[in-house]
Amino acid sequence: MKRRDFIKTSALLAAAAGAGELMKAETMPAAKPEAASDPMQSDEPNEPFEDRLILSAPMLQNFAATSIGVAFAVSALANGYVLVGEKPDLSDARKFLCGGYRVTDIDDRVIRVRITGLKPATRYYYRIGADRIRYDGGYRMKILGNEEDSRTYHFTTAGAEADAHFCVINDTHARWEPFGLVLDKIAELAPACVIWNGDACNVEETVEDQIRIFLNPDIRRKDYASEMPYLFCPGNHDDRGMANRHLERVWMFRQPEERLPRDWDLGRNFAVRQGDMALIGLDTAEDKLDTNPIFAGLFTSGPYREAQTEWLRDALAREEIRTAPYLVAFCHIPLFDDNPRHNPGDIAPADKDPQYSTDFAYWQRTCARMWAPLLEEAGCQLIITAHQHRYRYDAPTADRPWAQIVGGGPDLGFTGSGDNRKEDPGKFPTVVEGLVHRGHLEIRVHNLVSGTIQDRFTFRPRR
C-alpha cells in the first residue's frame, strides 16, 4: 500500500470538530477560530511530528442493518473519529467520535468508533481521522494536531434489500502465506460481508500482537477490511493470552444499546439479515472444560454458552430473521462429528479419556444440545464450523436436518514439519462462499491449494 497523505489541521479546528455530544451523529459545521485566550489552545497548535499518527487502514467490524464499527491503529495518545455520509464527497458528513457516552475513548494504540443510526442496505462513504493528544492530568490536556486519512472509503449496511452473498474464512492462525491466499480469493469473489469463523489468533499476550493480526498484518492487502465488513465468531485460541482476554480492545463489541440489557456481555454474537439470508453467529468458546486444571478456574465458558442460548432463542424470533428464506449459522467448534474417537468436549473434569484421540474438544456436544434444537425448530439449513483444520461436509439426515461444513485449516497441502513433513492433499485452506442464485442458496467451497471449487451444495428455502 502506498504511503498516505495526511491532512494537518490546527488544534483549534480539531477541538471544535470534537465538541459535539459524544457518539451522537452531527452535521459538520464550518470551523471557526476560537479566542487565543482559550486555555485548551496550544502555543504551537501545529507542532511538527515525524511519526505518523494513523498507522493502519480502517477495519470494518460487526456490521448490522443500522450500525457498523470502524477500528484503526495509532502511534500515540489520540482521540479518533469517523466522518460518514451518503455522498462520495462527504459534503453531508456526520462525525462519530470514539468511545461511549460522557467521555471519548483516548487511546495510544487502537481507535474504535461505533457508528449507529444508519439506514439498512445503504451505501455510505467514510474517512477516518485522529487528534493527537497531550495529557498531563485531569485539568491539563490539549490537542496538538490532527491527521485525516486522505482516502475516502465506503461500506454498505446489512438488510433485507442487501446483496445475499457472504464468504467464510477460519483458522488463519496468523500464518501470513495462507492468510494472503484467503484474502486474494475474498477480493476476487467480492462478497457483501465476511465471517471470520475463529482462531485468527494463537496465544496473544499484548495488544501489539492483536494489532499485527487484525489491523496491520504482514500481507499485501493492508486494507483488506476497509470496504468489506467483517463479522467474527471467536475460536478457542482467540481467548488465550492476557491480551485476548479482552479482545474487544481491538475487535470492538457492539454498543450496549444495540442489544438487550440481559445480553450486554454478548457483544460479538450476531443475527443479521443479508438479503434473503439470515446469518447467526455463535461462540463455542474454549475447547477445554472450565474445570480443566490447565486453566486454573479462570475461564467461564459454561455460563457463557448458556447465556447465548437465551439470546439465540430471541434472535431467531425476530421478524427480519424469522422471515428470511435461508438460515445459516456459524460457530468455530463443530456441533456434530460421527467419529467415535473425536472428543465431544464434555469429559469432566480434565477432558481426558483413553477412548478419545485428544484431550481437548474436537466437537462441542454441549453446544449442540443447547443450540441445535432451537436452530432445527427455526428451519436452519446449514451450520458452518471450523477448528479441525480439515475440510468436511456432513449431509443432513433424518435425525439431524441441518447440514454442516467444517472449513479447512492453514496447512498448504502438507502435515507435520521438518523430517516429519509429508504431503496431505486433504490439508488446504478454504473460503466457503454462500449466495442466493436462481431461487436457491448455493454454497461453494473454494480449495486454495488447488485453486478449484472443491464442492458445491444447494439448499431450498426453509419451510
Segment roles from a protein language model:
Residues 2-168, 187-189, 327, 433-463:
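Acidic, histidine-bearing metal-coordination/catalytic regions of metal-dependent phosphoesterases
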Residues 10, 159, 170, 234, ...:
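Residues at the C-termini of beta-strands that transition into short coil/loop
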Residues 72, 124, 171, 194, ...:
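Divalent metal-coordination and catalytic microenvironments
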Residues 125-154, 208-322, 348-362, 370-376, ...:
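Extended active-site neighborhood of metal-dependent phosphoesterases/phosphodiesterases
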Residues 163-233, 238-239:
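Conserved, compact domain cores that house catalytic/ligand-binding motifs in diverse enzymes
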Residues 169-173, 198-200, 236-237, 284-285, ...:
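Active-site metal-binding loops of divalent metal-dependent hydrolases
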Residues 192, 325-327, 381:
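Conserved acidic residues
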Residues 319-340:
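Short acidic, glycine-rich surface-loop motifs adjacent to enzyme active sites
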